[in-house]
Amino acid sequence: MKIIITEQQKKTITNKSDWKEGNSKLTKTFYFKDYKEVMPFVNSVMKIADKQNHHPDMTVHYDNVKLSITDHDKGGVSEKCHKFVNAVDKL
């Protein structure tokens, strides 16, 4: 069952933070100068994920990190996902 988020939530995600919705998940790539900037970001995301008990898929490269988040229990994007992306965007 795919969870539908409200149009307002979609506008917030799309317009303010560049998260893309597709395949029942939210995805965003964050770009950095180099690996020394990447790893502190990854550690900060890990802390958010542990605190919220909602863990993204992360792909780490030399100068970027791709995050994808979905709610496996709900079968798609949920309010938990929305809360997670808002917290990450505050980093």
Name these PLM-found stretches.
Residues 17-21, 46-56:
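Short arginine-rich
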Residues 23, 60-64:
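Short Gly/Ser/Thr- and Asp/Glu-enriched loop/turn motifs at secondary-structure junctions
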Residues 25-33:
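Short, well-ordered beta-strand elements within core beta-sheets of diverse protein domains
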Residues 43-44, 86:
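Solvent-exposed alpha-helix faces
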Residues 66-91:
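C-terminal structural segments of small proteins and small subunits
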